A protein has these predicted regions:
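An N-terminal assembly and electron-transfer interface module characteristic of large anaerobic redox
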Residues: 1-284
Length: 284
């Protein structure tokens, strides 16, 4: 049961039981060894059964995989939480094996409805939409920011012309963006820890990228401040910038397989529904 549960305390308790079975002394492992399938995580307290925000207008939710907790691979999530804490936000983590499971999704939906965070940072991969075409994160009326925990090491990421590998681009950028999430950057790479000579083993863990984490937290902070202008009835000025190719006027806003002009018109039309002062919106 302990090995099935996962988590550092359960692993320590399992090793203690093995030691006792071998006739060796092992100190008791204090604390709850069970790791729920879905729940809350706090930077200082770890997994908690209940959570209520003390400052709901400054709460940020970070959604991530339960497997990060089970394998004690939380350094990137901890550092991301610390970056938002430094900026004055309260942070709560919500973990689950997947966002697509209806049971877990229902729990997450209710949690987000209750907490009403000012932003959600998603650290899971791929699309989070289930068979009904919806994601449990959609219940939030706030932006959902996607971050990437790269499966490559830092050297490969730095040397690659596109940064993230094709697999990481699909997992962390393309499919989440199709869901409507805002890609905000990479926060970690996969690195080997120091080799244990006794176990003859090196763990590969998500290793935080300090400067990139600061960029992500700063970007989200600016989005939240921009939202506050709407609440204060001070409408910000928004521009849509489209790319082009020099000397090829027929390729204005060119995108492979996408109609960027139609997308821009649709975005402008949506903005007009939110009382934004827009005129002469093109029909295409």
């Amino acid at each position: 049961n302990l090995t099935d549960t996962g988590g550092s305390k359960a692993a320590a308790a399992a090793l203690a039981q093995l030691a006792i079975s071998a006739g060796l002394y092992a100190a008791p492992i204090i604390g709850d060894k069970a790791l729920p399938d879905v729940g809350y995580w706090l930077p200082k307290d770890g997994v908690v059964s209940e959570f209520s925000s003390h400052n709901k207008y400054q709460l940020i939710c970070i959604t991530f995989y339960r497997s990060f907790l089970a394998s004690e691979d939380m350094a990137a999530i901890r550092q991301l939480s610390a970056a938002f804490d430094f900026l004055g936000y309260q942070v709560v983590g919500i973990f689950a094996p997947t966002l697509k499971n209806p049971e877990y999704g229902s729990w997450i939906q209710q949690a987000i409805k209750t907490l009403q965070p000012v932003a959600i940072i998603n650290a899971t991969s791929f699309s989070s939409k289930g068979t009904d075409g919806s994601s449990p994160l959609d219940v939030s009326k706030t932006p959902i920011f996607q971050v990437a925990l790269s499966t490559s090491n830092k050297k490969n990421w730095v040397d690659a012309s596109r940064g993230l590998s094709p697999t990481d681009l699909a997992m962390h950028v393309v499919l989440p963006e199709v869901d409507g999430k805002i890609f905000s950057g990479i926060i970690s790479t996969k690195e080997a820890t120091k080799r244990d000579p006794n176990l003859q083993y090196s763990r590969f863990v998500h290793t935080p990228l300090d400067e990139r984490i600061r960029r992500v937290s700063a970007k989200v902070d600016k989005w939240i401040k921009l939202q506050s202008k709407y609440r204060e009835k001070v409408a910000p000025k928004v521009a849509i910038v489209l790319s082009t190719y020099p000397g090829k006027k027929w390729q204005m806003a060119h995108a492979v397989g996408l109609d960027a002009l139609a997308s821009a018109a649709a975005v402008a039309a949506d903005c007009s529904l939110t009382n934004s002062d827009l005129v002469d919106i093109p029909t295409r």
